[in-house]
């Protein structure tokens, strides 16, 4: 009998094709008669456009046309569609596909050049002359919130996009009876995410069929189709969106962008395919960015560290526009109270416009921000009350017997936040055991005696993964006998093709490699939302399971009729159905599938629908909560400010583990992302002019493989009761607690200097400044 696929480290099915250079990314696609487009982008962070002179560009040989917003007729009056609208939004400002009369960040598109090839298009774009009337810039969200602040949009009353409240419990009572109240402020940087593949789009229009086909490097083909249809006022069935191989997503590719819309309109206008590939500089200037928030926090607690309540004000920098609604803001407040049973929370998040690139969710969305605040606050309590950091966390955890646990908070749709399953205390114990935490403390003390500054960091988290409501899947047996899985979801390197095959294969007694998988094509796949928020394994995964189960049941019923027996007498292995009592009596899936394909004078058996196939949608109104705890060991050189990462341990609970190797890969990648956020990545702007400063990979630093510690991973499985596989998300679990854990370790290493670290990233220069400031305070 075939061994089960789910739960085993099946080698990635994608790798053979991708490693041999057989992948098919957007830039690998070239269509007959294709044109290239390039954008003329704003060199000012805030200005009025007085004039745009395109004459020289239009005169260049090989240029097909140069277009401004006014050249698109009635559509010029329409701004981009707002994703995720909310009644909390005061100013639903989205950008026009090309600037109307005002630019609000460096890199905003003003005009577009279409030419016979990219080289000509780039040269022509350089010939377009834009005359600006500069306006004051606002680059700091806190300054944007001031009553006398300059305006990011000249016709707006102020810079406040929205205010998001998040509260439950009696916060006044919690603070009134608390013997201890501590206050802290935290700053979290703005960063960029650098997928190996930048964005790109190709649009083709078939005038005879009135059909649009769009290839785009996206995490959300169905959402792109929806927004294109809404903007163009076309039926969705007249638009096909394909996500081919996508070289990394991490969140920014979940949004829809002006470039997709402009390419589509030009393809219709010119009746020729249009291609645009983003270069790395454009990526720095235009692709949505991450994380930029200021927090002022108060915590009320008892003398033993038990937290009674937390209140906070967050000032969130959303950049110049609001393309993705309040999703990033909501995911910054909704994680509270984290892994802890805290009875009262009161948070206000002010979402501010600034003259910077818009921000949207990036790996973890707002959860790393919230977890940083929560975990640093736990460290503050331990430090101020001279308590053990571990005991403070254990004292406040939601306990195993409390699941399912209602926090008291409610989503905007009125559904209460409920943690479905887990054992947070055990997960922390596991990582302490794996890291030999008590021995780590001894090692740090011994190192200190030699003048070596080592520290240990701790952080715990939980994560709402598998976001509702659905992700569809179709499973069918082809007449050849091959099992075929179609998903509207698409992969950006997570290994979705592999886990889809593993789940389906188990229903037919096959190896994962026997399954064909197709992803991310709106013309043939079941409806889908997006590959975001660690959601596909716990939404599409159960849908694959349910669809495969339905196909299996249909095959059993048909085989039972074929053998003239009851269904419970039939079994399956290696794609062959047989009688349990007489294994030699058998019929293949191929033969069964052929029975359900009608032909001339050939009918489908009575009582059966055509095709050995099924489409399923696992639907849910609640997220499933993954969780974990991390420990980091670091060494700090107080002469240079350099931080060396010695070891990193992860205990992780994502419910049923479909593929341990893939989960480990996701965790390792997530930790690397956290290292980048904590120590290296910082998108800097000139505060007076709004000009971006770190616009290449020599100035904007990413972590290298040589800077990575050994990452030790252990799994705890507490299956979720909310889906038939028991799975939870894993894609962001390395990043969400990682930043807090690393900063905690660095602060611990610098205990002799009484350094307090409430911000990131920690460059060597910043760390040296903190050490010197602490020394001065000590002397004073």
Model region roles, listed by residue range:
Residues 16-17, 126-135, 139, 219-221, ...:
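Extended active-site and interfacial segments that coordinate phosphate-rich ligands
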Residues 76-81, 124-127, 225-227, 250-256, ...:
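Short acidic, glycine/serine/threonine-rich loops at helix termini
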């Amino acid at each position: 009998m075939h061994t089960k696929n789910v739960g085993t480290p099946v080698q990635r099915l994608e790798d053979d094709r991708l490693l041999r250079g057989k992948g098919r990314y957007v830039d690998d696609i070239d269509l007959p008669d294709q044109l290239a487009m390039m954008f003329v982008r704003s060199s000012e962070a805030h200005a009025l456009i007085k004039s745009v002179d395109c004459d020289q560009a239009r005169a260049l040989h090989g240029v097909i046309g140069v277009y401004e917003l006014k050249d698109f007729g009635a559509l010029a009056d329409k701004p981009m569609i707002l994703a995720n609208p909310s009644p909390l939004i005061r100013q639903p400002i989205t950008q026009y596909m090309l600037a109307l009369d005002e630019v609000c960040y460096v890199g905003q598109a003003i005009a577009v050049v279409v030419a016979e090839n990219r080289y000509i298009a780039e040269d022509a774009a350089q010939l377009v002359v834009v005359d600006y009337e500069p306006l004051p810039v606002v680059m700091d969200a806190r300054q944007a919130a001031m009553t006398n602040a300059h305006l990011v949009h000249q016709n707006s009353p102020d810079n406040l996009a929205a205010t998001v409240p998040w509260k439950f419990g009696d916060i006044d009572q919690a603070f009134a009876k608390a013997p201890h109240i501590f206050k802290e402020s935290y700053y979290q940087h703005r960063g960029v995410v650098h997928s190996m593949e930048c964005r790109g789009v190709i649009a083709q229009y078939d005038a005879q069929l009135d059909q649009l086909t769009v290839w785009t490097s996206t995490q959300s083909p169905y959402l792109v189709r929806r927004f294109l249809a809404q903007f163009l006022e076309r039926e969705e069935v007249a638009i096909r969106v394909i996500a081919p191989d996508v070289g990394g997503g991490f969140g920014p590719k979940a949004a829809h962008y002006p470039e997709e819309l402009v390419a589509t309109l030009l393809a219709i206008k010119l009746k020729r395919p249009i291609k645009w590939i983003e270069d790395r500089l454009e990526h720095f200037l235009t692709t949505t960015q991450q994380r930029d928030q200021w927090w002022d926090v108060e915590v009320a607690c008892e003398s033993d560290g038990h937290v009674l309540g937390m209140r906070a004000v967050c000032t969130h920098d959303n950049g110049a526009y609001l393309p993705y609604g309040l999703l990033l803001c909501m995911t910054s407040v909704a994680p509270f109270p984290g892994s802890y049973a805290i009875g009262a929370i009161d948070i206000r998040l002010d979402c501010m416009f600034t003259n910077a690139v818009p921000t949207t969710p990036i790996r973890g969305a707002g959860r790393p921000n919230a977890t940083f605040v929560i975990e640093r606050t736990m460290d503050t309590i331990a430090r101020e009350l001279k308590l053990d950091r571990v005991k403070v966390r254990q004292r406040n955890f939601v306990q195993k017997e409390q699941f399912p646990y209602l926090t008291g908070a409610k989503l905007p749709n009125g559904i209460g936040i409920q943690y479905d399953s887990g054992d947070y205390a055990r997960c922390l114990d596991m990582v302490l055991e794996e890291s030999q935490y008590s021995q780590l403390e001894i090692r740090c003390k011994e190192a200190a005696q030699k003048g070596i500054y080592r520290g240990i960091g701790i952080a715990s988290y939980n994560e709402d993964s598998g976001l509702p409501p659905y992700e569809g899947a179709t499973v069918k047996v082809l007449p050849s006998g091959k099992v075929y899985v179609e998903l509207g979801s698409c992969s950006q390197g997570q290994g979705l093709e592999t886990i889809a095959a593993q789940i389906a294969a188990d229903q037919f007694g096959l190896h994962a490699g026997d399954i064909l998988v197709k992803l991310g094509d709106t013309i043939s796949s079941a409806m889908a939302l997006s590959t975001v928020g660690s959601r596909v394994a716990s939404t599409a995964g159960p849908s694959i399971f349910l669809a495969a189960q339905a196909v299996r049941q249909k095959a059993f019923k048909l085989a039972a009729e074929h053998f003239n027996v009851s269904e419970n007498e039939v079994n399956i292995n290696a794609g062959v159905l047989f009688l349990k009592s007489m294994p030699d009596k058998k019929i293949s899936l191929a033969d069964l599938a052929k029975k359900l394909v009608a032909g001339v004078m050939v009918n489908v058996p009575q009582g059966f629908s055509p095709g050995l196939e099924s489409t399923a949608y696992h639907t849910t109104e609640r997220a499933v909560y993954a969780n974990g705890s991390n420990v980091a060991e670091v060494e700090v050189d107080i002469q240079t400010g350099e931080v060396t990462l010695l070891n990193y341990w992860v205990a992780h609970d994502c419910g049923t583990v479909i593929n341990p190797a893939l989960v480990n890969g996701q965790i390792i990648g997530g930790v690397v992302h956290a290292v980048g956020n904590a120590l290296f990545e910082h998108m800097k702007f000139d505060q007076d002019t709004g000009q971006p400063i770190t616009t290449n990979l020599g100035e904007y630093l990413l972590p290298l493989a040589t800077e990575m510690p050994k990452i030790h991973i252990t799994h705890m499985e507490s299956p979720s009761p909310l889906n038939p596989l028991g799975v939870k998300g894993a894609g962001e679990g390395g990043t969400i607690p990682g930043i807090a854990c690393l900063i905690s370790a660095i602060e611990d290493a610098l205990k002799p200097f009484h350094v307090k670290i409430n911000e990131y990233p920690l460059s060597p220069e910043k760390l040296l400044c903190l050490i010197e400031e602490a020394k001065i305070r000590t002397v004073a």
